[in-house]
Amino acid sequence: MVSSNFYKNLGPRKLTAIIDFLHDIIAPPKIHEDIAIHDIKILQEASPNDISFLSNPKYSEFLKTTKAAACIVPKNFTGEANPNTVLLHAQNPYFAYGKLIDFFYTPIKSYPAKIMKSAIVADSATIGKNCYIGHNVVIEDDVIIGDNSIIEAGSFIGRGVNIGRNARIEQHVSINYAIIGDDVVILAGAKIGQDGFGFSTEKGVHHKIFHIGIVKIGNNVEIGANTTIDRGSLQDTIIKDLCRIDNLVQIGHGVKIGKGSIIVAQTGIAGSSTIGKYCTLGGQVGIAGHLNIGDGAQVAAQGGVAQNIEAGKIVGGSPAIPIMDWHRQSIIMKQLLKTSNSKLKK
């Protein structure tokens, strides 16, 4: 059940209007124009007034028993379904679901074009049109914030930082030494632009190296809660356009992440490594320093990468090896343990 404390339901919507809104839907030739859809629900919970979706074949069985008025299914779906449920075929049901959420819901919380009285904004800072600056925000000298941006309560924007248009910076984010593009979302607690972990050791003493690089973040990037992105020592830390970075990710100094890459929670990338375009790093992946991960490469969850990965390769395990080799090793290890246990029992 979606809580009305936080989200406003814009329904009901006519099913015919939903089909028009989604554009790329293949629907039955005749649909009654009076069918009204009140909400979006998972198959198991949907009522005759709801629409649902099927993007994972694991849930196909629920399509037989669902009470949903309509369901978005894959384009090539030919399985069984409740005869009372209208099937809407889509190339990407999950993408269609994402669009439907925007069609049905809007947050209750709004952000007026306003600087709250408790915010501290330097006289030399430039705040764009229609911006919201929340309670106890600190914006230092020479900061530039683009039009239509939101800076939520308790965030800190350090001297000289440049943030583009349509940014959404959630609560208690700190940003220093950074240039950030348009349409960027930074979730609560993220820390951007602090010193990297750089020391030189002389006679048993670890001497801190002053970092003179910055962080550059492209357009349409999302950075998760409590993620940390260090600025470079000499070279900049760079996050290219369209990247999606999950919560609790550590990105070291001088790291470069290519366009459209996805990095899942609790991953750590050591300094000066380069991640190519449209790469995927699963949860808890570790990337050693000064490595190159080629375009389109994928690392399975908990993979430990200690050497370069060629473009398009899929690896897993620690140390990471080609994914099929990792699967074979796992099977062999299981068999060896089984044999060993049998011998011990004898």
Curated annotation (Swiss-Prot):
Pathway(s) annotated for this protein in UniProt: Bacterial outer membrane biogenesis; LPS lipid A biosynthesis
Enzyme class: transferase
Record-annotated active site: 253
Name of the protein described by the UniProt record: UDP-3-O-acylglucosamine N-acyltransferase
Catalyzed chemical reaction(s): a UDP-3-O-[(3R)-3-hydroxyacyl]-alpha-D-glucosamine + a (3R)-hydroxyacyl-[ACP] = a UDP-2-N,3-O-bis[(3R)-3-hydroxyacyl]-alpha-D-glucosamine + holo-[ACP] + H(+)
Function: Catalyzes the N-acylation of UDP-3-O-acylglucosamine using 3-hydroxyacyl-ACP as the acyl donor. Is involved in the biosynthesis of lipid A, a phosphorylated glycolipid that anchors the lipopolysaccharide to the outer membrane of the cell.
EC number: 2.3.1.191
Top-level taxonomy: Bacteria, Pseudomonadati, Pseudomonadota, Alphaproteobacteria, Rickettsiales
Family annotation (InterPro entries): Hexapep (IPR001451), Hexapep_transf_CS (IPR018357), LpxD (IPR007691), Trimer_LpxA-like_sf (IPR011004), UDP_GlcNAc_AcTrfase_non-rep (IPR020573)
Protein family membership: Belongs to the transferase hexapeptide repeat family. LpxD subfamily.
Subunit structure: Homotrimer.
GO terms, molecular function: N-acyltransferase activity
Pfam families attached to this UniProt entry: Hexapep, LpxD
Gene3D superfamilies in the cross-refs: Hexapeptide repeat proteins, MurE/MurF, N-terminal domain
Keywords associated with the record: Acyltransferase, Lipid A biosynthesis, Lipid biosynthesis, Lipid metabolism, Repeat, Transferase
GO CC, any one term: membrane
Gene Ontology BP, a term: lipid A biosynthetic process
